[in-house]
Amino acid sequence: MARTEDDSWEITESVGATALGVASARAAETRSQHPLISDPFAQVFLDAVGDGVWNWHSAPQLPAELLEIEPDLPLQMEAMVSYMASRTAFFDEFFLDATRAGIGQAVILAAGLDSRAWRLPWPAGTTVFELDQPRVLEFKAATLAEHGAEPACGRVAVAVDLRQDWPTALRQAGFDPSVSSVWSAEGLMPYLPAVAQDLLFERVQGLTVRASRIAVEALGPKFLDPQVRANRSARIERIRAVMAHVEPQREIPRTDELWYFEEREDVGDWFRRHDWDVTVTPSGELMAGYGRAAAAQVEDRVPTNLFVAAQRN
């Protein structure tokens, strides 16, 4: 499904469906013997939407026809769960470190099915602003309310498209740009054109003061590599062709059709230019640090993203 300038989506459609894939990985990690993170609400979202490809991680076994053409698929899926678990732990720790240091405002850009407002032990008085499409936020809040879950902080939903004037919406929701804040942009960058990425950071710059912090999952050096793109596309098409025959109800999305393959400024460089102290951790290093390095035969299937942590001077 190609993107348009004003596209929107339900939770099971387009960009919304990718949030279910991430929730599936977090649910699988939570069920594992030695989980790196605990997200008791991830499975709640999956149960609410019913069967789909996002339930692969809980399937007793994959179709034999699929394993014939992609024998390493179980290892690929295991590696992606480890990647998502490491990513989640990185952002969890980033938020808690900042708020325990006295920052009282947290902003989650493109919050999706992120349940941090409910599951993290936030310091008393913390306000968490969640920004995303209206239908995504409505689904999340309604589903968790039906489950009896309550936020562990002062949670504020800001229903707005990040391509629109979200800074005004954020301020109107109670955000105070005159005091320090902590931000996240997780799983967002490939869905933004290069110009929109720059605008996003410029707006964050205009809403932050000294000691504010931001963590970004930035695109790595291989994102635009033609061979990497071709290999990924061919692999997805092979899997889609088999699944259309054996399990047509579990359509494999062409996630890469939702991405913007454009040259863009390195995220770490952007923040350094704007007087932020920056630390960059490659995804492989992050995963290894958590004891979750991918198996050698599938490490090229794991995103080579960069995890950027920055504090404003």
UniProtKB/Swiss-Prot annotation:
Q: What parts of the sequence cross the membrane? A: none
**EC?**
2.1.1.-
EC primary class: transferase
Q: Source organism's superkingdom?
A: Bacteria
Q: Which family does it belong to?
A: Belongs to the UPF0677 family.
Q: Does the keyword Cell membrane apply?
A: no
Q: Which NCBIfam families does the entry mention?
A: mthyl_TIGR00027 (TIGR00027)
Specify the protein name: Putative S-adenosyl-L-methionine-dependent methyltransferase MUL_0706
**InterPro entries per the UniProt record, alphabetical:** Ppm1/Ppm2/Tcmp (IPR007213), SAM-dependent_MTases_sf (IPR029063), SAM_mthyl_Trfase_ML2640-like (IPR011610)
> Is this entry keyworded Metal-binding?
no
Chain residues that bind S-adenosyl-L-methionine = D132, D161, L162
Task: Recite the UniProt keywords alphabetically.
Answer: Methyltransferase, S-adenosyl-L-methionine, Transferase
Pfam family, any one: LCM
Q: Name one GO biological process term.
A: methylation
- Function, in words: Exhibits S-adenosyl-L-methionine-dependent methyltransferase activity.
Query: Species name for this entry?
Result: Mycobacterium ulcerans (strain Agy99)
Molecular function GO labels: methyltransferase activity
